[in-house]
A protein has these predicted regions:
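Membrane-embedded alpha-helical bundles that constitute the cytochrome b-like, heme-associated redox core
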Residues: 1-170
Length: 170
């Protein structure tokens, strides 16, 4: 593989962009760690309230991050990157936003329906199914994202160093 020269390397992301990125890593990891194992756990009113608030905050931060990133930041991929890699990067990034948004929105819907007494039936089962599919999809997309970052670390094209604060490409 040919390595890109320094003229073609991206300049990097802003401090805010990096903070939002790594903050979401922490928030998502926490959400997975404390996840509800069964819907019946939502009988605990305090847990139900916490889950809905957590999902609402997560969704709000996700929307803020999306608008910040799309309005103020540009891709860290070098201009010489193949068109299909640029397309794949967009699909994975937007896919992560959609899957994260679906996780939070479906979680809120589950919480609202459960609090209204809708604890079984097609509607809540469909929303739980969407929630589970979104979580699974997010795992695959995150794995692709991490693998692509590692790939770019080995390319030494500046993509890794644009967002990752350790193991710089120097």
């Amino acid at each position: 593989m040919e390595q890109s020269n320094s003229v073609n390397k991206p300049s990097g992301y802003s401090f805010i962009a990096k903070t939002l990125h790594w903050g979401f890593v922490a928030i998502f990891a926490y959400g997975i760690y404390k996840q509800v194992d069964t819907i019946e756990q939502l009988e605990d009113a305090a847990l139900l309230r916490f889950e809905v608030i957590f999902a609402a905050v997560f969704l709000t931060l996700l929307l803020l991050r999306f608008f910040y990133m799309t309005r103020t930041q540009s891709s860290s991929l070098p201009e010489s990157t193949a068109w299909w890699q640029k397309l794949a990067a967009k699909v994975v990034h937007y896919g992560i936003y959609v899957s994260f948004g679906s996780i939070a929105a479906s979680g809120i819907l589950i919480g609202v329906l459960y609090s209204l007494g809708v604890k079984a039936g097609f509607v809540i089962e469909a929303i739980v199914g969407l929630h589970e599919i979104s979580v699974t999809l997010s795992y695959y997309l995150i794995a692709l994202h991490v693998l692509a970052a590692i790939y770019h670390r080995f390319l030494k094209d500046g993509v890794w160093s644009a967002m990752v604060p350790v193991c710089k490409e120097d």
